[in-house]
Amino acid sequence: IVNAMKKILWIVSLLAGSGVFGAQGAAALLKGEVKTYDMDGFRLHVYLTQDALGDATTVVEGRDGLVILEMPLFKENLKEFAGYLKGLGKPVVKVVADYHVGGVADYAPDQVVLVEGMSEFAKGAVYGGMLEGFKAAFGDAIDLREHAGHEEVPAEGRRIWAGVAFDFSRGASSD
C-alpha cells in the first residue's frame, strides 16, 4: 500500500494543526474547522473533523476542480463537508481513498481512486477488523456503505488531476 501518501497526509495534518504553513484562512463550521493554505499552483484546504477519531480530510483545489484526499467517516462531518465543497464552486474531480474507504459511496466510480492493493487490504483482517470495531463503537453515525466501484492507480506513478500533479510511491514493505 502507499505509505508515502499516508505520511504526507499525516504531515499535512500535523503542520496544519500547528500553524507551520501559516494559514491563509480558516473557516469555523458547526462541527469541524477548515484551514486553507495557498501553495505553488494550488490551494490546500484541511478539514479538521473534530470527530471521535480526530481525522482530517484534505482538499487540493486546482485551477479547474477539487481532489479530495481521505473522506470523513462520520455522517455529520460528511454533510458539513459536502456543504463546504459546494461553496468552493468547483467540481470534485477525484476522491483518493487510501486509508479511508468509508464516506465515498455518493461518488461515481470514475471519481473514486484507490491506490494499488488498497481494495484487497480493506477487505483483510487488519483494516476490516478496524472497521468492524468502528461499527461496534459508533453504529449508524459512520458511513461504511460500499462504493459502486473505483479506479485503481499504480503504487508508482504520476497522475494529473485538476491541473495538479500527484505522485504515488510504494511505501515500506511492512505497510
Residues covered by each model-derived region:
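Conserved beta-strand hairpin/beta-sheet module of binuclear metal-dependent hydrolase folds
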Residues: E33-G87
